[in-house]
Curated annotation (Swiss-Prot):
Gene assigned in the entry: groEL
Protein localization: Cytoplasm
Protein name: Chaperonin GroEL
A biological-process GO annotation: protein refolding
UniProt-listed Enzyme Commission number(s): 5.6.1.7
Gene3D superfamilies noted in UniProt: GroEL, GroEL-like equatorial domain, TCP-1-like chaperonin intermediate domain
Family: Belongs to the chaperonin (HSP60) family.
Organism of origin: Aquifex aeolicus (strain VF5)
A UniProt-annotated Pfam family: Cpn60_TCP1
An annotated GO cellular component: GroEL-GroES complex
Length: 545
């Protein structure tokens, strides 16, 4: 085991502060509409130009092991906020730095940091309550477009495309962001449930021009295992032929005489059919088949149920208005499942998303959720250069997350105004003792920092702007604030300067959590740098007489 270095008390906190400041100072310059760009140099490839706080934070790794602990903890604030809310990473970083700075100041004066932390937690709880009171539901398309525009660093083109996507697939629908092969940014919407499996034989094609197999009002057989023996398949085929409707077979694989029988009957016009492989692998395949069964009102014939293929009846098959199968995709449109069962399945997947700790699992669960909820929207981001494309793609991804957060929990006035208004409620909040009161005062001061930083990045005096915003709140209403893009004081809702409540809430909660943890730390432990062993080269060899 490598030797460790340990530092304590003031020395430990000073190192944490140095690390926090190095990261936060690089990130906070990007805050607001007039935030500056940060250029990230790479060992290979072109440098990346970005205004995205979490992208900047992720690049930072400090040489000093103790300072790096502080930097990594604040990086965690940015990453966690991005994961939960999709935006607000820079705000969270600014808040964490401000809370930690103020906390260090009171700790140096001899306050009990454990009581100070209790005061901080109490104040954050109150701030969150106030944010909920300030929050306004997002229902109108115009508001969705405004949120998306702001989250994409005031790019109205991206705002409009995201609003279109949300309108098409709804709040639970999946919006994926891909790189376009052209300079244009476009939107493509796939209605219904689509999975990445195409027909098993080109002989199933019904539209030679588009190379698609289109089945109108088909039955859908959902089977977990391989189908090779035609005898197993024959009973259900005969029932489907009598019904006069087409058949889609979804199975692990369809091969041999079973596939040949389907193809021959399809070509002769006896039974319009198509066979595709089931999506996914292992347990994930079972989940997908279960989703398809719920969506189409059928039954997934799995080994667990003990049902043999030859004993399957028509009422076990799923049904849909239409199925379109091409070489690579299968799309089920208008599944005829029970809406209540679909709703229950959606709720079950939502719970799994909340409980999972794996990013990969979360992504796959969200894909399943979207497919059940009614569609997938693909935003293809285009730009003139590779560097611009990467930066724009980051912004679009952020904006999609933030817009979903706004639809989920509502919106508050942007530009740091919501936190300033919420902080006014702390005037009446009393701690159990003097040190807790110091913690409450820390939050009261810290939550006003984002507004000051936005003003400063735009070239204005943050303290002067803050005073004016507090004054306007009393005179004209809580939604009045400072538009850093124009330098004017406006009604933030009317000017379209808004933040998703979830973003602001997550930012303050995560920032206070990490800053409080750092304040109460009394020791830091890090690996000692390894001493490099001197290589013995031929020149180092002793000379022989």
């Amino acid at each position: 085991m490598a030797a460790k270095a340990i530092i304590y008390n003031e020395e430990a906190r000073a190192k944490l502060k140095a690390g926090v400041d190095k990261l936060a100072n690089a990130v906070k310059v990007t805050l607001g509409p007039k935030g500056r760009e940060v250029i990230l140099g790479k060992n290979w490839g072109t440098p990346v130009v970005t205004k995205d706080g979490v992208t900047v934070a992720k690049e930072i790794e400090l040489k000093d092991k103790f300072e790096n602990i502080g930097a990594q903890l604040v990086k965690e604030v940015a990453s966690k906020t991005a994961d939960v809310a999709g935006d607000g990473t820079t705000t969270a970083t600014v808040l964490a730095q401000a809370i930690f700075h103020e906390g260090l100041r009171v700790a140096a004066s001899g306050a009990n940091v454990m009581e100070v932390k209790r005061g901080i937690d109490k104040a954050v709880k109150k701030i969150v309550e106030e944010l909920k009171k300030l929050s306004k539901d997002v229902k109108e398309r115009k508001e969705i477009e405004q949120v998306a525009t702001i989250s994409a660093n005031n790019d109205p083109e991206i705002g409009k495309i995201i609003a279109d996507a949300m309108e098409e697939v709804g709040k639970d629908g999946v919006i994926t962001v891909e790189e376009s092969k052209s300079a244009e940014t476009t939107l493509e919407v796939v209605k219904g449930m689509q999975f990445d499996r195409g027909y098993l034989s080109p002989y199933f094609v019904t539209d030679p021009e588009k190379m698609e197999c289109v089945l109108e009002n088909p039955y859908i057989l959902i089977y977990e295992k391989k189908i090779t023996n035609v005898k197993e398949l024959l009973p259900i085929l005969e029932q489907v032929v009598r019904s006069g409707r087409p058949l889609l077979v979804i199975a692990e694989d369809v091969e041999g005489e079973a596939l040949a029988t389907l193809v021959v009957n399809h070509i002769k016009g006896v039974l319009k059919a198509c066979a595709v492989k089931a999506p996914g692998f292992g347990q994930r395949r079972k989940d997908y088949l279960g989703d398809i069964a719920v969506l189409t009102g059928g039954q997934a014939i799995t080994e667990d149920l003990g049902i043999k293929l030859e004993s399957v009846t028509l009422d076990m098959l799923g049904q849909a208005e239409k199925v379109v199968v091409d070489k690579e995709h299968t799309t089920i449109i208008g599944g005829k499942g029970d809406p209540e069962q679909i709703k229950a399945r959606i709720e079950q997947i939502k719970r799994q998303i909340q409980e999972t700790t794996s990013d990969y699992d979360r992504e796959k669960l969200q894909e399943r959720l979207a497919k059940l909820s009614g569609g997938v929207a693909i935003i293809r981001v285009g730009a003139a250069t590779e560097a611009e494309l990467k930066e724009k793609k980051y912004r679009v991804e952020d904006a999609v997350h933030a817009t979903k957060a706004a639809v989920e929990e509502g919106i508050v006035p942007g530009g740091g105004v919501a936190l300033v208004r919420a902080s006014e409620a702390l005037e009446d909040l009393k701690g159990d003792n003097h040190d807790q009161q110091l913690g409450i005062d820390i939050i009261k001061k810290a939550v006003r920092t984002p507004l000051k930083q936005i003003a400063y990045n735009a070239g204005y005096d943050g303290s002067v702007v803050l005073e004016k915003v507090i004054e306007l709140g009393k005179e004209k209403g809580v939604s009045w604030g400072f538009n850093a893009a124009t330098g004017e004081y406006v009604d933030m809702y009317e000017a379209g300067i808004i933040d998703p409540t979830k973003v602001v809430r997550t930012a303050i909660e995560n920032a206070a959590s990490v800053a409080g943890t750092m304040l109460t730390a009394e020791a830091l432990i890090a690996d000692l740098p390894e001493e490099k062993k001197k290589d013995i080269t031929p020149t180092d060899m002793p000379e022989l007489d």
